[in-house]
Each structure stands twice: as structure tokens, then as C-alpha cells.
Amino acid sequence: MLTFGSIGCGNMGGAILSGVAKLEKWQVIGFDPCQAATDALHERCGLRACDDEIEVAQQADVILIAVKPQHVQGVVEKIAPHLDGKLLVSLAAGVSLRRIKTYSGDTCPAVVIMPNTPAMVGEGCCALCLDDPTLNEEQKKLVLGLFSAISTTVVLHESHIPEFSAFIGSGPAFIFHLLESFVEVGLRLGFSYHDAKQLAEKLMVGSVRLAQENPEVPHAKLRMNVCSPGGSSIVGVNEMDRLGVRGAIIETVLATHRRALEMSAD
């Protein structure tokens, strides 16, 4: 039995712990200053709470650093004497692999990951950076298998993490922004808030499911399948084009990417 430990058990750390807990041959432990967080995870996935960060480092085979970026240095330096033979994983945005290795005194291999919030419901995407030259093939296979089992996972060089961050890490914020707009227009059209919200969410989920179930069909074809010549749907699509919706979405992600590059600069 292998042990996966997380220092930080908030939304993202908790989501990953919950996913790992479902896998065979893994048990989960964690520490968070907020006892309510570890209590909730104990009920949800059987997490065993630790008294502090050092206990996690001592007992876990794989240690997830799931704290805010400004706290990473202090946490990693604190547990550094206990990392021999361990595998360190960091999800802190903007904290480079080089910095993680420096904080740990290069006492163990490290992996940088970039998940997104749908991981909280088992529908996440995750980028893995396996650039650390001290990672052996067995460790790479272990971490890739682990995260592939709980999310849609891609392996990227660290230089490409900002692209993933802007596109996929921040992507849920943009989807929810669009979802809010659909709910708002539902209200304007006379639906109750409950119905507008429920229908808008199902619209998003159902449309994506249709695309996933028909991988050979281009998205443009699926769009045109909704639009009849001279009908109302094509008028709406043309209005989106007139307003530059496609370009606005592209520029939104590119602006996010520029900021992600700034944050990743050492």
C-alpha cells in the first residue's frame, strides 16, 4: 500500500485526495490548518489527518504541496529534512520547478502539476511537468499513472505550463462566465431562476456530451446541424459573429496567457 499525502486540503488538494482515495493500493493522509477541511475529507474519502506538515512528509510516499504560492517556500523548507526517498508534487501556480528544488535542497525528485477545478467532481484536466532530471522512469510511470487515473492528463515541458494554465487552468472561469450569461438571458425570457440555471447547465453538459460522442464530427458541423436556412438559430450565430464573440474569447485566453507568463518568470 502506497501513501499519498497532501499539505493543504482545500478545494484543489481535497479534490485530488478524493480521487486518489478511490484507487487501489493507495491510502491518503493530509494536513491543513483548518481542521474542518480534514474532517470533511475524512468523511468523504477516509483521509487520515496528520498533526503537522512534517508528519505528512515522514509518512507519505508522494507529497502534494497544495498551499497558496506565497506559502510554498516555508512549507517545503520545513519538510526538506524528511524528503529522502520521497516524491514531491507541487500545484502552486507560478512556482517553478527550479524554485521547488531550491527550497527542498534538491533532496528528492519533484513534479510540477497544473490541475483545474472540475477535478473537484472527477472531470478535471491536469498538466504534468516531468522535467526534473532526477526523476527515474519508475517514478515518472507512477505519477503519470496516478494522475491519469483521476483526470485527463497531458505531459508538458515546464515552458508550456503557462499555455495550459491560460487555456485549461483558467478555462472554467470563462465557461462559468458564459453560463452566467445564459442564465441571465433565461431570466429575461421569463424563466424562473431555478429553471434558467438548470436548463443552462444541461445545455452546456449536453452539447459537450454530443461532441464527445461524435468525435469524428467537426464542431462547426454540429453547430450547423442546429441551424436551418432562414431560421432563428442562424440569425443568432450571425449576431455572435457580428459582435466578435469568437475573437473576444480568443483574446480573453491570450490576455490570460500573458499574465501567466509574467507569473511564471523567475
Cite the ranges covered by each PLM segment.
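NAD(P)+-binding Rossmann beta1-loop-alpha1 motif at the extreme N-terminus of oxidoreductases
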Residues: M1-Q59, Y103, E123-G124, V185-L189
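Internal alpha-helical scaffold of NAD(P)-dependent oxidoreductase catalytic cores
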Residues: R99-P109, C125-F164, I175-N214, R259-A260
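NAD(P)-dependent Rossmann-like dehydrogenase/reductase catalytic/cofactor-binding core
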Residues: E201-D266
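A short glycine-threonine-serine/GTX helix/turn-capping micro-motif
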Residues: S165-A173, R223
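Rossmann-like NAD(P)(H) cofactor-binding subdomain of soluble oxidoreductases
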Residues: V20, I29, C45, E53-L128
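Glycine-rich beta-alpha junction loops
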Residues: C34, A93-V95, P115-A119, I168, ...
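Small-residue helix-packing motif on alpha-helices
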Residues: T38, V56, V72, S192-A200, ...
